[in-house]
Amino acid sequence: EELLLNDLCPDMKYCCEDLLMKKQVSFLPGDAETVSFPTESTLITSCSALQWFESPENFFERCNTLLNNQGYFAFSTFGKENMKEIRELTGNGLPYRSREELEVALSPHFDILYSEEELIPLSFEDPIKVLYHLKQTGVNGLSTQSSPTGKQENDLCSSDNNSKNNFKNNLPQQQWTRRDLQLFCERYTQEFTQGASVSLT
């Protein structure tokens, strides 16, 4: 048995050095939509990456050709409700697909054995803490061109990683003025306060 790890960033290999010490484990950097993966695989799995892909639909078809007849494809990704609060206030965000859309895209290539969607609302002391959380948790699909006052212009398992232009860890406040940030916080507090905190989906 062999395990092949993949990430868009080559430096991620340093985060799994302990695994790579085993001879049956290897690391292949590159774009998961185009990199050459081995055929006749028994399992392809992806965690929180498909939302960055140019075409998840094409990737699903590709995975089908890479798996053996008894192979499995399992992944988790984010749905349409992800960071909806930020999207409503800035008009910016990734084009997330719904669970139903993903199932439709999977159906021509796989028998869907399991599908589930979960909403996990988070609570923060104030909107500044929300922005800090987004910065600390990595890429988020927010552009430095977002306006704080502008309006808007899931787990699956099947039987048988990116939108490269958006792959940046830039929070919008990098080009916001102090007034912009103040307006964002005021609107966020007004629209998304729950009890003594503000929410983020």
What is the meaning of each model-derived region?
Residues 33-44:
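A short acidic, Gly/Pro-enriched loop at the edge of an enzyme's catalytic core
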Residues 72-101:
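Conserved class I S-adenosyl-L-methionine
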